[in-house]
């Protein structure tokens, strides 16, 4: 029986989940929910189903894998990764995965703040990258070395 991934009909938070499902060659179906046009942004397609799925915390994205029902994008990613032994075997490897997961979240949040800003534009991005708030690393620096990796 295929897993079921539910999310809005956009890339958003579910896109990393889709990529991991594809990478792991996981059999899954997708349920996409539409949002109506402005100014109402009708969400009734999702709201009509939201409380019928048996989710502990009804939200999007969600993943249903048999009796396992998950929400929250990072919890879903970790669940899939654990199923496919992608979370490391040693404590050191698991720590690295934890750190990288949180670093990716920080980068994603910083980019979202820029992209969803009402003042979004190249001047704004350029100013941010020249400011003291912009941190190029540690992932993008030569110092970001994991032992002998």
Model features per residue range: what roles?
Residues 1-126:
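GST-like domain detector, emphasizing the conserved glutathione-binding G-site
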Residues 1-4, 131-149:
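C-terminal helix/juxtamembrane-tail motif
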């Amino acid at each position: 029986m295929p897993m079921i991934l539910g999310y809005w009909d956009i890339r958003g938070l579910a896109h990393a989940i889709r990529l991991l499902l594809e990478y792991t060659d996981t059999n899954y179906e997708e349920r996409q929910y539409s949002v109506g046009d402005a100014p109402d942004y009708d969400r009734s397609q999702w709201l009509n189903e939201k409380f019928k799925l048996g989710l502990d915390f009804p939200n999007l994205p969600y993943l249903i894998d048999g009796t396992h029902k998950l929400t929250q994008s990072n919890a879903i990613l970790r669940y899939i990764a654990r199923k496919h032994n992608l979370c490391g075997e040693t404590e050191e490897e698991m720590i690295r995965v934890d750190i990288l997961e949180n670093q990716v979240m920080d980068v994603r949040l910083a980019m979202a703040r820029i992209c969803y800003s009402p003042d979004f534009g190249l001047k704004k991005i350029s100013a941010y990258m020249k400011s003291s708030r912009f941190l190029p690393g540690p992932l993008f620096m030569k110092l970001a070395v994991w032992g002998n990796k």
